Amino acid sequence: MENLDALVAQALEAVQRAEDITTLEQIRVQFLGKKGELTQVMKTLGNLPAEERPKVGALINDAKERVTDVLNARKAGFEEAELNARLAAECIDVTLPGRGQTTGGLHPITRTLERIEQFFTHIGYGIAEGPEVEDDYHNFEALNIPGHHPARAMHDTFYFNANMLLRTHTSPVQVRTMESSQPPIRIVCPGRVYRCDSDITHSPMFHQVEGLLIDRGINFADLKGTIEEFLRVFFEKELAVRFRPSFFPFTEPSAEVDIQCVMCSGKGCRVCKQTGWLEVMGCGMVHPNVLRMSGIDPEEFQGFAFGMGAERLAMLRYGVNDLRLFFDNDLRFLAQFR
């Protein structure tokens, strides 16, 4: 048993000298593993007389338990020290400023659409929507643009087949509203429209807002007053406005609306091509043929319509010189409009 006591003393001394958990594991294998020194002592019991085996076996088991307990205690100490060191390294100073959250913002086109809708709903207009995949009748025929009409050349249209297409304006929403509702009608129709055109001032997909008012006794003065007030509120400036005679198949008389250049205050600059004026929208009195085709008697009811591009107004309001910037998804650009 002197040999057993020496092995235990040797094991305990090795445990005390160990500096990490890896060394402790090596000591465990050395003394308690399958081929460990204390395990080998246990295997010598077979050489002892039968009456001595229980006593010696108990001594060996006691020795193994002592070594195991000291090993486990030492290992627990290392684990606690390691945990404390990690906690100290990962300690959070609660007095430091928190990590700020980067807040998003509405897209400038969305802001522009909301601004337009807010004005018109405030004066009693409703919001109307319709399908973006439209039929030829509602996109052209019902708007006084028959198949042979030269005005169709004004629209570079995306066709699916001879009858179905991507709408080129939101005017079909007005037609569908007139077909399903009785006057008085006061609506604005915001939405995406599609034309085969792409350059610095055009996109194959863009946003348009068209308005329609149908009632008794409506005249061009009502249209003029509505548009002038809208432009004043939208740009938050007292801008000069002019109406130039123009042509649209679905309105008569028709006009283009110009405003005094917001960049140079009418003095003339590169943006307005030295004219002092910027075109912002088209308008006119609803053509009698359009009213008739929608089931409304033009002898009893009159109306006006107008249409504007949201991107065009956004470019003027925010001073953007390239329409494509709105759709490039560049956060450096979009973050300016929070």
Swiss-Prot record:
Mg(2+) binds at E252. It comes from the Bacteria. Signal peptide: none annotated. CDD domains: PheRS_alpha_core. The gene is pheS. Its cofactor is Mg(2+). It is found in: Cytoplasm. It comes from Pseudomonas entomophila (strain L48). GO terms for molecular function: ATP binding; magnesium ion binding; phenylalanine-tRNA ligase activity; tRNA binding. Its EC number is 6.1.1.20. InterPro entries: aa-tRNA-synth_II, aa-tRNA-synth_II/BPL/LPL, Phe-tRNA-synth_IIc_asu, Phe-tRNA_ligase_II_N, Phe_tRNA_ligase_alpha1_bac, Phenylalanyl-tRNA_Synthase, tRNA-bd_arm. This is Phenylalanine--tRNA ligase alpha subunit. Coiled coil: none annotated. Belongs to the class-II aminoacyl-tRNA synthetase family. Phe-tRNA synthetase alpha subunit type 1 subfamily. GO terms for biological process: phenylalanyl-tRNA aminoacylation. Its main location: cytoplasm. It catalyses: tRNA(Phe) + L-phenylalanine + ATP = L-phenylalanyl-tRNA(Phe) + AMP + diphosphate + H(+). PROSITE patterns: AA_TRNA_LIGASE_II. Binds 2 magnesium ions per tetramer.
